[in-house]
Amino acid sequence: TLHEKATYGILQEFARSGLLKMLYLVSNINLENILGEVPIIGYNNKVNELLVSTVHMINVFKNSDPVMGGIEEPAEASRIATFGISDIEGNEEKSFFSLDRAKEKCYIYSINEERLKTEGDLRKKIVSTVKAQAETEDLKVSFGVFPTNYQQDYCYILNYTSIIQSDNR
């Protein structure tokens, strides 16, 4: 609706002007594509679970000490953002919103502590993946590696821009 489009644009302008510290954009369509086939009953629960668990884990890591790297604050002007996930090899990034012209990206690697202790080439893999992203996308890229007790490894992504986004829901 016209009201939604106006609000969408105004919130982005508020973020750019500094009235909002950060505006995170999320598309239900993108979340659904990440999840794959989701039944009608339970649809909202699955979509919300993906979003909430991602935001929760990013907040946990923002308040934790990495064993390598760090989560850098974005530039003052980069106040429009979205989340994403990837496998830790960086083969396929899945963004929660398709940002036009992202300027900065932060990878948050959540890796099983035992793997961090035993896998000798893991550091090299992570650094080469991050470097490749910085070169191919012409972005400022940072990353942090965090130990976990989870068996599954995860890579969370924060994408930032200062550019007003079109409504691509």
Show which residues each predicted segment covers.
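Tubulin/FtsZ superfamily GTPase core signature
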Residues: 1-169
